[in-house]
């Protein structure tokens, strides 16, 4: 069967749902597709389809990242449903990096919970520029004052992570009731989408910069070759363009021989697109998650850099104790996850939770990086720091 061509008419935006486990992120994602499907803006995707990776079923919690697409009158959206449970924050770090904006889902029954805080922090550290809040399960709260209190708490939390908590739209509703077709709650979904349309700015796409796409996954397709998937971070790619694959080892040169998005063929891909790229003459095992595909000569792999880093407090889910020179956590750059050694400044004996400090970091394998890129520091399955590269050393 031949694939249909992907039409670019409306501006495109990548968003996602974030928030605490069981606050209703996946139900809301399903409800958005249901309500928008009634005006032809989406194909209804039910909860089980969004929550679909095999290991997810066993634990009843969302683990991997699901992509759905829909459109409003203003924009076309690719929506990511992010994992909620802290065991799977690793996935969120790479997932949240794919967002131009996010819908923070907070249960009106519980109010903000530990992962609500962690996801706001992660959004801040991976550079999600703006958030809209959906106060879910309001049908289960009888006292309007209670809703006002929860809303106030959410606004204060957003402000504490340097988001404009006073102006962020907070929409009250019930994703489940909307999914069940109750008119009042379907209206709250439309109101939410209106807030997303108007409040989350149309991202400035860096079309003019050299092409770069972090590698998320690699597949081998019989008779066609190797396909690499990811979200284009900057620039454009056309069929026939030369590219380089960089990081985690030697640099490989190849050519882009095909591009597809949402199972439709494209002539070109551009910043913001989640796409699959067919590459010529490269074996499946020569490319791995964590590398980047880029315009030849545009990016260099590095191992040593200076960074400004914020170390999370115990209350934020970070370390309980200080760390010292030569501490070795994991560093997350885009989709890469690499061990590195930390060198403290000469006048600093140790770094305590809550400190903001300049560090020199040396990774065990080179990663494509440039000044201004953000990264996360993790240890034993939890985020312990957020940083930005201030200077490349080697």
From Swiss-Prot:
Belongs to the TRAFAC class translation factor GTPase superfamily. Classic translation factor GTPase family. EF-Tu/EF-1A subfamily. Residues 60-64 are annotated as: G2. CDD domains: EF_Tu (cd01884), EFTU_II (cd03697), EFTU_III (cd03707). GO terms for cellular component: mitochondrion. InterPro entries: EF-Tu_GTP-bd, EF-Tu_GTPase, EFTu-like_2, EFTU_2, G_TR_CS, P-loop_NTPase, Small_GTP-bd, T_Tr_GTP-bd_dom. Residues 19-26 are annotated as: G1. One of its GO terms (biological process) is mitochondrial translational elongation. Residues 136-139 are annotated as: G4. It comes from Reclinomonas americana. Pfam families: GTP_EFTU, GTP_EFTU_D2, GTP_EFTU_D3. This is Elongation factor Tu, mitochondrial. The keyword Protein biosynthesis applies. It is found in: Mitochondrion. Residues 81-84 are annotated as: G3. Transmembrane segments: none annotated. Residues 174-176 are annotated as: G5. Keywords: Elongation factor, GTP-binding, Mitochondrion, Nucleotide-binding, Protein biosynthesis. It comes from the Eukaryota. This protein promotes the GTP-dependent binding of aminoacyl-tRNA to the A-site of ribosomes during protein biosynthesis.
